[in-house]
Amino acid sequence: MSKSENLYAQAQQLIPGGVNSPVRAFTGVGGIPLFIERADGAYLFDVDGKAYIDYVGSWGPMILGHNHPAIRQAVIEAVERGLSFGAPTEMEVKMAQLVTDLVPTMDMVRMVNSGTEATMSAIRLARGYTGRDKIIKFEGCYHGHADCLLVKAGSGALTLGQPNSPGVPTDFAKHTLTCTYNDLASVRQAFEQYPQEVACIIVEPVAGNMNCIPPLPEFLPGLRALCDEFGALLIIDEVMTGFRVALAGAQDYYHVIPDLTCLGKIIGGGMPVGAFGGRREVMNALAPTGPVYQAGTLSGNPIAMAAGFACLTEISQVGVYETLTELTDSLATGLRHAAKEENIPLVVNHVGGMFGLFFTNADTVTCYQDVMNCDVERFKRFFHLMLEEGVYLAPSAFEAGFMSLAHSNEDIQKTVNAARRCFAKL
């Protein structure tokens, strides 16, 4: 029995499913999850001593690669001053200034501890600000595990085959209207059915929780126009895309202005951090200046702020996103060519530093139904073949992949060569 197998057997007796987040259990692909001992650069090293080229990147945060020296040093220095104070710090102010400088649509920002906290709080704020109850989200999009958002959600919910989670009261879910991603007509229909009741739309600008689905050109501008027409707020959930698609996020890449933005993953540099922010008028409705309550014991803690500040400082350097995009383009092109050589039908979507693989005969994949029509069983086989080759992809057909600046051209060529061998076995 390998060390991973032994640890998993122990973990299953102590932790539900043996993991602290469902997708890690390999439920979506079968088999025993890897237990990781350490990571460095573009590589993970499991407890059995095997190395893997990593395209999960801790599910997005590791844009600089693992164990980056600047982040590591910032954390060490912060730890020496104390772990948490329960009081404001200078680093919170510096971090808020940096975030609002980098994302111009955010006049003000509130730090939290996770992406789920960010989206949950932003929706509460939108409801409080507008005095309305209903929200619009999109089928297959995942915005964390808050009750109102686990309605036809993507990501882990899709991986488990449970689009709706037990434990979410019907009375909560009835306020969530679900529309079709990339389909403006479905959104207009929802607004027209409840013209004075919708507080906000929340949307992933690139849907990264039903793999990787970029928006059609008219989609995000159309959402902005509909929100303006019906008096609702537009919340762009950039937990995944923020600082990954572009320095100012997917909202800048696609030229759309939200009322509120949610951030996570990269903003923490690998530490648990989330944030939400937006127009000053809306943000001032938050306690203590306004009536909408939100709080957190460890929000803005000095260790996480130090890691996040170091990460954002590094990725603000000239040429970072050109390099990241070139690396992702190279991987996507190589995978397409390798699949074609082996007569494997494959669609590869990619934007900035994220990508998605779809085993399908379709020419494009643009919505939830397209994703559900893909060959999940073939993905499962491909995943395990690649794992044997030393390439770690997301263990689910419904999760995006992530490039880092630590990946080299050699890493990408190794990945493409491995994929070619795996395609030949499918």
From Swiss-Prot:
Its EC number is 5.4.3.8. SUPFAM superfamilies: PLP-dependent transferases. GO terms for biological process: protoporphyrinogen IX biosynthetic process. Pathway: Porphyrin-containing compound metabolism; protoporphyrin-IX biosynthesis; 5-aminolevulinate from L-glutamyl-tRNA(Glu): step 2/2. GO terms for cellular component: cytoplasm. Its cofactor is pyridoxal 5'-phosphate. Belongs to the class-III pyridoxal-phosphate-dependent aminotransferase family. HemL subfamily. Homodimer. This is Glutamate-1-semialdehyde 2,1-aminomutase. It comes from Yersinia pestis. The lineage of its organism: Bacteria, Pseudomonadati, Pseudomonadota, Gammaproteobacteria, Enterobacterales. The gene is hemL.
